[in-house]
């Protein structure tokens, strides 16, 4: 099984919640684990808002980098992200959710690129065939 781990799942793992323990178990059982580089930026933003000390932030980002393959955006992924974003917008409207972020589309495009499942608790992903939903 191949995984793409999003910000939601990583944060739950760092908090030590039941969802985080499930994330840890999924990671330990996976064949290949990827984290889009934008997830690192999302996590940095969250922890800066919460005023987490820089050493702890760096340690968490290093955990992600040493545990997974950190993937970037190339031209092909960028091209695939556009229609995936529109797909997520339509899904959000049907579900009466706020608009998804472009980050969500990049995460889903990455999962599709690498034939992976997205580990998340983000409602924008609920019900998608690629999703392992944390609940």
Locate predicted features.
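Active-site-proximal, substrate-binding regions of enzyme catalytic domains
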Residues: 42-87
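Residues that scaffold the ATP/ADP-binding catalytic core of kinase and kinase-like folds
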Residues: 13-14, 46, 81, 128
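Histidine- and aromatic-rich ligand-binding microenvironments
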Residues: 5-6, 35-36, 100-101, 122, ...
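Active-site neighborhoods of divalent-metal-dependent phosphate/nucleic-acid chemistry enzymes
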Residues: 70-117
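Short active-site oxyanion
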Residues: 1, 30-33, 66-69, 112-117
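Acidic, PIN/NYN-like endoribonuclease modules and their adjacent C-terminal/linker elements
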Residues: 108-135
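Short, well-structured N-terminal submotif of metal-dependent ribonuclease cores
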Residues: 1-35, 47-63
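A generic structural signal for short hydrophobic patches within well-formed alpha-helices
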Residues: 10-11, 40, 125-126
């Amino acid at each position: 099984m191949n995984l793409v781990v999003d910000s939601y799942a990583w944060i739950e793992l760092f908090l030590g919640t039941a969802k985080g323990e499930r994330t840890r178990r999924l990671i330990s059982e996976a064949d290949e684990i990827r984290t889009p580089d934008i997830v690192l930026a999302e996590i940095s933003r969250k922890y800066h808002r919460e005023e987490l000390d820089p050493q702890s932030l760096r340690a968490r980002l290093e955990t992600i980098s040493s545990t997974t393959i950190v993937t970037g955006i190339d031209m092909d992924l960028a091209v695939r992200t556009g229609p995936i974003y529109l797909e997520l917008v339509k899904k959000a409207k049907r579900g009466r959710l706020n608009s998804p972020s472009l980050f969500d589309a990049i995460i889903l495009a990455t999962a599709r690129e690498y034939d992976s499942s997205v580990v998340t608790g983000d409602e924008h992903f609920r019900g998608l065939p690629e999703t392992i939903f944390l609940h």
